[in-house]
Amino acid sequence: MTGTWTKALALTAALASGAALGAFGQAQTSQTRREPQFENENVRVWKSIIMPNQPLSLHRHDFGRTIVVLKGGSLDIVDAASKTMKTLVWETGKAYWLDKDPAGEEHGDLNRGAAPIEVIVVEMRK
């Protein structure tokens, strides 16, 4: 009986640990983030997932880039004070070109919608 009880306790502990890790994994993936995909001297590629009301931090782009939209929506390009500089409307399945940013200008990307926006960014380095 003791062996069965020990196995049951071990199984319960393992399941509880797995559930906790699963919840942690879900919390991690529900954050706005960039996921590197590929990089060399010519190009840098990443996936951006922009959750509602979780802006990407201030940054700039020194090179032009193609945006391939996996999940579309409206994206506000905001300044350091969170003031909207422009709004981009991206349709799922479409691709868009964005020029490099003006010298010295930084921006954040803010999704004010209800669903995540997901894009692949292909930044040309030459």
Where is each model-derived feature located?
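Short acidic-glycine-tyrosine-enriched beta hairpin
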Residues: 39-42, 83-101
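Boundary of Sec targeting at the N-terminus
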Residues: 24-28
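Ligand-binding loop in jelly-roll beta-barrel domains
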Residues: 101-125
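Histidine-centered metal-chelating micro-motifs
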Residues: 53-57, 93-109
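A short glycine-rich, His/Asp/Glu-containing loop-to-beta-strand
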Residues: 32-57, 62-68, 120-122
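Bacterial N-terminal signal peptides that target proteins for export
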Residues: 1-10
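Bacterial N-terminal signal peptides
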Residues: 10-22
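Glycine- and acidic-residue-biased ligand/ion/polar-headgroup-sensing regions
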Residues: 61-81
